Design a protein with these regions (language model features):
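Short S/T/G/P-rich N-terminal loop/turn motif that feeds into the first structured element of a domain
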Residues: 1-72, 81-106
Length: 106
């Protein structure tokens, strides 16, 4: 079963759009390195908080992606736009309700 990697990005005030412009290509590259899916969410209550979620079959593919020359260069280009340190965390799917049909409402 695939594992999910989460990275919480906390962006400096007035820098979110520029950071997003720099970091957007990194999301596409995750797919090229073998991620099943990749998306970025933005907190409704805190628009400076972004969460990057990637789904991987193999942690080694994430490591190849994260430490690749391309992604390292993008992180360096975005260095002045986000709070450090960055930390990622791994999650496994505990329940997947997508294949379960909901019972009819009464």
């Amino acid at each position: 079963m695939a594992d999910l990697n989460y990275i919480d990005w906390h962006i400096h005030p007035f820098r979110a759009e520029r950071w997003l412009e720099i970091w957007r290509p990194a999301l596409d590259r995750a797919l090229a390195f073998g991620a099943r899916s990749c998306y970025l969410t933005r907190d409704v209550d805190d628009p400076l908080h972004f969460r990057q979620v990637t789904v991987w079959d193999d942690h080694a593919d994430f490591e190849r992606y994260w430490y690749s020359d391309e992604i390292t260069a993008l992180r360096e280009a975005a260095l002045n736009y986000f709070n450090k340190p960055l930390s990622s965390s791994w999650h496994t799917v505990a329940v997947d309700a997508s294949g379960v049909e909901a019972p009819p409402l009464k």
